[in-house]
């Protein structure tokens, strides 16, 4: 891969690679590892689902009572990684994080399937529960409560991950991989090549 192969905007470059991963029938191309840290710097990571790009950032949605949400509120910086084995490509991002507005979260919530909307009410994410039956009971309760329209819970919504650094990696023979890094400087993106 050559520098001239890259677009000047890393978000647009990401979209190209993401679409390529979809065309190659990658299993869960929208899965990304999100790394956060609490106010003391203790890190944690987990897979989340990427839900699009808006206003210069990657969108994710979660329960605001979850560990990730607490950490993003305490320390609004994050790192994230997409890896697509079928195309042998990886994209890394780092940057600041902001909560979406209630209106943005509700607009996305309305696009979710009925079952996913119910699940948002059911899961007390990251909290200890007694057993699986507890979840099933809650699921039945909320299906009964919301038989038609499911409103967006106040404790559920999105975050925008706004990168100031992004890295695009392509695996090559003999471990001579291609790595290009986009760095945001004075509101402009600078692109440099990194050693593998």
UniProtKB/Swiss-Prot annotation:
Single GO term (MF): pyridoxamine phosphate oxidase activity
Top-level lineage group: Bacteria
SUPFAM superfamilies reported in the protein's UniProt record: FMN-binding split barrel
Cofactors (names): FMN
Residues reported in the UniProt entry to bind substrate: 51, 108, 112, 116, 175-177
InterPro entries, alphabetized: Pyridox_Oxase, Pyridox_Oxase_CS, Pyridox_Oxase_N, Pyridoxamine_oxidase_dimer_C, Split_barrel_FMN-bd
Main EC class the enzyme belongs to: oxidoreductase
Catalytic activity annotation: pyridoxamine 5'-phosphate + O2 + H2O = pyridoxal 5'-phosphate + H2O2 + NH4(+); pyridoxine 5'-phosphate + O2 = pyridoxal 5'-phosphate + H2O2
Cystine crosslinks: none
HAMAP family in the record: PdxH (MF_01629)
Family stated for the protein in its record: Belongs to the pyridoxamine 5'-phosphate oxidase family.
Name by which UniProt lists this protein: Pyridoxine/pyridoxamine 5'-phosphate oxidase
Organism: Coxiella burnetii (strain RSA 493 / Nine Mile phase I)
Classification of source organism: Bacteria, Pseudomonadati, Pseudomonadota, Gammaproteobacteria, Legionellales
């Amino acid at each position: 891969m050559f520098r001239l192969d890259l677009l000047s905007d890393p978000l647009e470059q990401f979209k190209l690679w993401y679409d390529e991963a979809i065309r190659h029938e990658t299993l869960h191309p929208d899965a990304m590892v999100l790394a956060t840290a609490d106010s003391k710097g203790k890190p944690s990571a987990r897979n989340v689902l990427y839900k699009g790009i808006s206003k210069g950032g990657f969108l994710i949605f979660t329960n605001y009572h979850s560990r990730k949400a607490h950490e993003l509120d305490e320390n609004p910086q994050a790192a994230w990684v997409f890896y697509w084995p079928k195309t042998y490509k990886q994209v890394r991002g780092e940057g600041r994080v902001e909560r979406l507005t209630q209106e943005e979260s509700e607009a996305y919530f309305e696009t979710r399937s009925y079952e996913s909307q119910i699940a948002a009410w059911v899961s007390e994410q990251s909290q200890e529960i007694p057993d699986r039956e507890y979840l099933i009971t809650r699921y039945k309760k909320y299906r009964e409560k919301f038989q038609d329209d499911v409103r967006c819970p106040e404790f559920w919504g999105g975050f925008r991950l706004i990168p100031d650094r992004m890295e695009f990696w392509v695996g090559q023979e003999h471990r001579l991989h291609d790595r290009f890094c986009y760095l945001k400087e004075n509101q402009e993106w600078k692109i440099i090549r990194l050693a593998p």
